[in-house]
């Protein structure tokens, strides 16, 4: 899985760098600004540079931001772990509602305005139409949201609620050339039409 993600990101970055050659600001300059924006935001919060053993994340609005990847492109603050006995497996539908905020505005002191689908209730399942297939990075309908939004589901359960920082390299591929880091307020759901299978405790088997 990691090799597939790395290859896809590499191809996307190559195309982004080529498309940025004619811009007044270089791709490197834009990446530098992105890092400054993220670092400024994180400087106002606690940061843990690794994933805790057994996913023992601190929870709540004062919890730290945990670095989820080796490159420092994804950071997560856990507001709710959700149902840890109800977790997705490969190709399960994961519905999500979110608001996202442009963190470059944080650096310039502008108001952060959230944009997203948090009020989307279209669809027979009542969860809206926005979903990805868990751990599937091949189908465009799933990969179009990037790798960052899937990361919390490696560690959390249904109805998990997190604040998630996603740099452009792990964000939506069609927006990668913009080099904008986003802060997501996102909640994940299992579909009632095809629910994830609950895990059984070893002591209760």
What annotation goes with each model-predicted range?
Residues 5, 21-205:
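Cross-family detector of peptidyl-prolyl cis-trans isomerase
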Residues 16-20:
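C-terminal motif of bacterial Sec signal peptides marking the signal peptidase cleavage site
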Residues 1-9:
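Bacterial N-terminal signal peptides that target proteins for export
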